[in-house]
Amino acid sequence: MAFSLENLRPAPGSRPKSKRVGRGSSSGKGKTSSRGHKGQGRGTGKVRMFFEGGQTPLFRRIPIKGFKNRNAKEYVIINLSTLEEVFEEGNVITPEILLEKKIIKNLKDGVKILGKGELTKALVVKAHAFSRTAKEKIEAVGGKAEVI
């Protein structure tokens, strides 16, 4: 028999039988239907997530700490290893070229070049920010690191 959507069945024993509750006392799951007597869990409905029974919940006991700076610049980060792979000796690299070649998806607040990886080609890199190691590595091979 060939496989098709209409004859797919779960492997025998892979799906547990459903628990049939409230079907008489001789079933073993009658009367209280495994819910016990009294208490919050005996009725219908669920307790909402993180509800701790009325005590002050954890998220309110822990102090508020820190904040998100609204003026912080969010740079798109590129490592030297990426520039080494994609560009040839003597190329001028600008954020617009990086967008064209689909190395970055968007500009956000600008491009920052980081120093991960080795650089062997002399490149002219124009970006909004450079890490100290990136600038040193670019200039060590005879390239230029220009801040826009």
Swiss-Prot record:
Alphabetical list of Pfam families matching this protein: Ribosomal_L27A
GO biological process annotation, one example: translation
Organism from which the protein derives: Kosmotoga olearia (strain ATCC BAA-1733 / DSM 21960 / TBF 19.5.1)
Name assigned to this protein: Large ribosomal subunit protein uL15
Superkingdom of the source species: Bacteria
GO CC annotation: cytosolic large ribosomal subunit
Keyword terms of this UniProt record: Ribonucleoprotein, Ribosomal protein, RNA-binding, rRNA-binding
Chain intervals for the UniProt region annotation (Disordered): 1-47
GO molecular function per UniProt: rRNA binding; structural constituent of ribosome
Function recorded in the entry: Binds to the 23S rRNA.
Keyword RNA-binding recorded: yes
Coiled-coil region(s): none
Family as reported in the entry's similarity comment: Belongs to the universal ribosomal protein uL15 family.
Oligomer status and interactors: Part of the 50S ribosomal subunit.
